[in-house]
Swiss-Prot record:
This is Snaclec agglucetin subunit beta-2. Disulfide bonds join C27-C38, C55-C145, C121-C137. The lineage of its organism: Eukaryota, Metazoa, Chordata, Craniata, Vertebrata. GO terms for molecular function: toxin activity. InterPro entries: C-type_lectin-like (IPR001304), C-type_lectin-like/link_sf (IPR016186), C-type_lectin/snaclec_domain (IPR050111), C-type_lectin_CS (IPR018378), CTDL_fold (IPR016187).
Amino acid sequence: MGRFIFVSFGLLVVFLSLRGTGAGFCCPLRWSSYEGHCYLVVKEKKTWDDAEKFCTEQRKGGHLVSVHSREEADFLVHLAYPILDLSLIWMGLSNMWNDCKREWSDGTKLDFKAWAKTSDCLIGKTDGDNQWLNMDCSKKHYFVCKFKL
């Protein structure tokens, strides 16, 4: 019996020590994984700034979602639609025309675009057409957070 407890304790220590290293490549509870990143659909409306702050507080490296391919955009729609139905979600671009900024809030390059119009802050539609629209940053919308595993 003592040996069983010792082995069980040892396995628990190993599991806990590996948990923070990315060894399991698993996303936290309520987060979904895609291509080495974790995504969280948040069904609480916030301004762009408050949504970005919320995402950065959830996980180290967390930000509003950045999208780098049509496949990732499709994944995002399939993830968000069942939770948010036909909604608009904040994405990680803001003040891009005022500051001539061409990167996502997570610092990654803007290498995939699906513009509908120019904007101060960027929202995406969850209805499957993957269009991005302009929106006043002070409006409140649902959002998706993302971080790299």
